[in-house]
């Protein structure tokens, strides 16, 4: 058993063994009180831990290149996001819908109405009325590229009151409505050009 220094029970001086993590206490009469664990290992751990604990926040906050994730760049509303939106979402022309009908109306607007009126009145009856069969036959002779289904659709659009026949005045009124509608659409598209490219708000 290694030698140890003894101290009185009063606790003025703590006795501990340098070679063993235990110390033996005796009272003033010399009676052995037993062997107790030495606080030396605990004190040494505290001395080693406190300096490391002081540096711990700095070690945790330090960033090493290559290990820490790179911060993501926030997309600016007026920057690259607009360019990506303009590339991924093409601006479509509203008049692209029903392109065949628009092409047909453009051909009608370019035609000489005087010549068409002569053919129209020749096929109409004494009241100036022209039924669907005669209307389709006239339009086939004028616009041979149009299908019969499209000509039937045109007849229904001209016959707005659904009487089953059309007159030259009805046809002129239809042409005026189409022209005014196209003019309003053209003006609205012209005004929209000042607001492009539109800003897309992300969800």
Curated annotation (Swiss-Prot):
Organism domain of life: Eukaryota
Signal peptide: none
Residue stretches of biased makeup (Polar residues): 87-107
Spans annotated as Disordered: 61-107
Keywords, alphabetical: Repeat
GO MF: calcium ion binding
All copies of domain EF-hand, residue ranges: 111-145, 146-181
Protein name (Swiss-Prot/TrEMBL): EF-hand calcium-binding domain-containing protein 8
């Amino acid at each position: 058993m290694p030698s140890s220094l003894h101290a009185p029970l009063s606790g003025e001086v703590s006795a501990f063994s340098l070679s063993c993590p235990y110390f033996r206490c005796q009272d003033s009469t010399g009676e052995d009180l037993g062997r107790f664990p030495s606080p030396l290992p605990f004190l040494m751990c505290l001395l080693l831990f406190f300096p490391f604990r002081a540096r711990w926040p700095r070690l945790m906050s330090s960033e090493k290149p290559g290990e820490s994730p790179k911060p993501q760049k926030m997309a600016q509303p007026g920057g690259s996001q607009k360019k990506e939106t303009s590339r991924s979402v093409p601006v479509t022309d509203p008049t692209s819908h029903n392109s065949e009908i628009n092409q047909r109306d453009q051909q009608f607007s370019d035609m000489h109405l005087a010549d068409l009126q002569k053919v129209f009145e020749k096929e109409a009856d004494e009241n100036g009325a022209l039924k669907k069969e005669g209307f389709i036959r006239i339009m086939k002779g004028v616009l041979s590229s149009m299908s019969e289904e499209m000509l039937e659709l045109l007849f229904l659009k001209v016959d707005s009151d659904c009487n089953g026949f059309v007159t030259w005045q009805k046809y002129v009124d239809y042409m005026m409505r189409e022209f005014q509608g196209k003019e309003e659409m053209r003006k609205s598209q012209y005004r929209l050009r000042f607001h492009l490219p539109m800003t897309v708000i992300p969800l």
